Design a protein with these regions (language model features):
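Enrichment for repetitive, rod-forming helical segments
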Residues: 17-19, 31-32, 115
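Extracytoplasmic metal-acquisition and chelation regions
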Residues: 37-227
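Bacterial N-terminal signal peptides that target proteins for export
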Residues: 4-27
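Bacterial N-terminal signal peptides
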Residues: 26-39
Length: 227
C-alpha cells in the first residue's frame, strides 16, 4: 500500500505554488516521516528520569490491568479518556508524539480503534524501537464472537472470563519488557485474577434473580454481545 498516494497537490496558492492536500492517511504518512526526528528529539532534549519503559495503552480498559500488573515506578499512560468512542477516535499530534516516545504500545485490535488500528499495525515496521501489540488479537478466534460477514466483535472486556485471558496475554507481553521480577509479576497477576473472579461472581449474583425470559438488554450500540 502506498501511504503517500493520497497526498497530492490539488490546487495553487496566490503565488502559483502547489498547495498540498492530505487524503485518507495523513497521520500515518506524517508518523513515518517524523519518526526518526521525534525519536532523536526525545533522546537529546528529554532525557528520561527513569530506567523503566514507557508503556502507552490506547484505552483505559487496557491501561487498568497493566497498572495493576506493574509496580508504580513504571510509566503507564492511556490515550482515550472516559466516554470516548474508540471507533471514532482521531489521534492528536500530541498522541502521535506519545506513541513514538513509548517503548511499548498496547491496543485492542480487531478495529476497535477504527482507522487508528491501521496506523498502529504499521508503526512497528517504520519504527523498530517501538513495540506495538494488538493484545486482543492474541486470543484464539474460536473464543470470539464473529458475525456472518466475518467481522469480529472487539468488545472482549465485557466478558470477564475472556478478559482474564487477555490479562494473561498482557502478563506474557510485559514479561518481555523492562527489568521486572517474574515473581512479583506473577503475584500481581494472581491478585488481578482474584479481583476479576470476584467481579464475575458479582455479575452472576446480580443477574441470577432475573428470569431467563426477561433478560433482554436494550442498547444504542452493539457492544454488549459478550455480556
Amino acid at each position: 500500500m502506498d501511504i503517500f498516494a493520497e497526498i497530492t497537490p490539488r490546487t495553487k496558492s496566490d503565488s502559483g505554488q502547489d498547495l498540498w492536500v492530505f487524503g485518507k492517511r495523513p497521520l500515518l504518512a506524517l508518523l513515518i516521516i517524523l519518526t526518526p526526528f521525534l525519536k532523536g528529539c526525545q533522546e537529546t532534549q528529554q532525557p528520561s528520569s527513569s530506567n523503566y519503559p514507557k508503556i502507552l495503552c490506547t484505552t483505559q480498559m487496557i491501561a487498568e490491568p497493566v497498572r495493576k500488573l506493574l509496580p508504580p515506578e513504571f510509566q503507564v499512560e492511556h490515550l482515550m479518556g472516559s466516554g470516548v468512542d474508540p471507533h471514532l477516535y482521531k489521534p492528536t499530534p500530541e498522541d502521535l508524539r506519545k506513541i513514538l516516545r513509548a517503548d511499548l504500545v498496547l491496543y485492542h485490535g480487531h478495529h476497535l480503534e477504527g482507522r487508528m488500528s491501521d496506523m498502529l499495525s504499521q508503526l512497528e515496521a517504520s519504527s523498530p524501537g517501538t513495540k506495538v501489540v494488538a493484545i486482543c488479537e492474541k486470543i484464539p478466534q474460536e473464543q470470539l464472537i464473529i458475525d456472518p460477514s466475518g467481522v469480529i466483535d472487539p468488545h472482549l472486556w465485557l466478558d470477564v472470563t475472556l478478559w482474564k485471558d487477555v490479562c494473561a496475554q498482557l502478563k506474557m507481553t510485559l514479561t518481555k519488557h523492562g527489568d521486572l521480577s517474574p515473581v512479583e509479576l506473577e503475584a500481581r497477576y494472581n491478585t488481578l485474577i482474584q479481583e476479576l473472579d470476584q467481579l464475575h461472581q458479582a455479575v452472576l449474583t446480580a443477574l441470577n434473580p432475573i428470569p431467563l425470559e426477561r433478560r433482554v438488554l436494550v442498547t444504542a450500540h452493539d457492544a454488549f454481545a459478550y455480556f
